[in-house]
Amino acid sequence: MLLSFDEVCAAVQGARVCDARGARGFDGVSFDSRAVVPRDLFIPLRGAHVDGHTFVEEALQKGAVATLIDQRYPHAGEYVAWCTRFGAACIAVHDTLRALQDLASFYCKKFPALIRIGITGSSGKTTVKEMARAVFSERYRVVATPGNLNSEIGLPQSLFFVRAEHEVGIFELGMNRRGEMRTLAQILVPHYAIITNVGCAHVGILGTQQAIAEEKKEIFSQFTEHSVGFVPDDAYRVFLSNIPYGRVVVYDQGGRGLATEVIDEGLRGSRVLYQGRWIRVPLPGVHNAKNALAVIALAAQVGLPAEEIQRGMERVKPPFGRSHVVCASLTFLLDCYNANPDSMAAALHLCAHISAVSKVYVLGDMGELGVTAAEAHYRVCVLAAASDARAVYVFGPEFCRAVRKVSWGRKRVYAFALEELSALQETLDAQLRRGDFVLVKGSRSVALERLEPLLRKER
């Protein structure tokens, strides 16, 4: 049993409208009626297009032993009747989303010995989480965010995976609106927190990069005097380091207790010198070397010895759609989970230092850039035009507009709208040659992983 109904009422300041027959608590939490299993607590959430209250009856039919309901909901009486019929508990709350968050926070506090680590940043959150999971698993029993459940709904969902045997919890904190990071920090209350970078992701929502930095900094808002934050050595270092409680470690090459040398080895990754040991980072790119520096700094603060840090780092696997290198008839780098101007520039920088007979770049639109989208896509096109790629393929309306504003010289350029995936596949298939190196980079919304079967084809 995760929590008793008495604990739920205390945590969410709810009123129990009716009791469950034969159950004192619940074993799991779900807000998706399709995923409900017996003995779940169902929490109906209101979205922009769908109201979870519509699915309360379905959740009860599938075996949910309790449901929360919004006490302001006009048909609350119907749900009480359903709960009575199915023998489930019904708890009325003022707001079901806030109740989910309060319940997750309450549940997390039941494990005071758990070392809580929070990770945020414009990019690199999931990669840093996976690096940290691998490193800390050398010594501790670790629980970590499944996938990228890092939002105001996803973080609470992640916290319910914590169990008594876990010693370290590593959680992503993402945001796409002002004020969300403080809410997430209040839910988790991290002992340690990493900011991977302050880029231009979400600039379309927050307006400026400075506003993004201010929002990311909120991950430190619940710090005590014993908490430790980690920030990169960049233009926002001083701003991010100025916090009222706790202390901040700046991670980068050099510095006391940190890596003293980094060697970029292209698609094979990089090597980092730490306490006399060369640690291999198996993910390509300088940006991933920086991600590794953050994790090394974190692990050193927690007290892991260098040999455990090395063993863990060297067994890191790339998360889905991130820095995934495949060597077949072609060599290709699949980095299609997320894209913003900074990660695009990092990918193109990586490719510039790769030795290949011929290079082909496939670039998909970057999302959530607002009024800066046109300029951002134009700048990426300028970088691509100056590269040594044989051909550049762009996919999406923003890049289709941007390519027309750039001088490409003798470089072949192909532009495809989102509804022209088949045409992109056919043209790419006809042009690729055995031995080519192909970069595939775009936002999640354009789903460029659909090109992978084509890229694996024997040539």
Curated annotation (Swiss-Prot):
A GO term, aspect molecular function: ATP binding
Record key words, sorted: ATP-binding, Cell cycle, Cell division, Cell shape, Cell wall biogenesis/degradation, Cytoplasm, Ligase, Nucleotide-binding, Peptidoglycan synthesis
Entry's EC annotation: 6.3.2.10
Keyword Ribonucleoprotein: no
Catalytic activity: D-alanyl-D-alanine + UDP-N-acetyl-alpha-D-muramoyl-L-alanyl-gamma-D-glutamyl-meso-2,6-diaminopimelate + ATP = UDP-N-acetyl-alpha-D-muramoyl-L-alanyl-gamma-D-glutamyl-meso-2,6-diaminopimeloyl-D-alanyl-D-alanine + ADP + phosphate + H(+)
GO biological process: cell division; cell wall organization; peptidoglycan biosynthetic process; regulation of cell shape
GO cellular component: cytoplasm
Disulphide-bridged cysteine pairs: none
Compartments, record wording: Cytoplasm
UniProt record similarity statement: Belongs to the MurCDEF family. MurF subfamily.
Protein name in the entry: UDP-N-acetylmuramoyl-tripeptide--D-alanyl-D-alanine ligase
Organism: Treponema pallidum (strain Nichols)
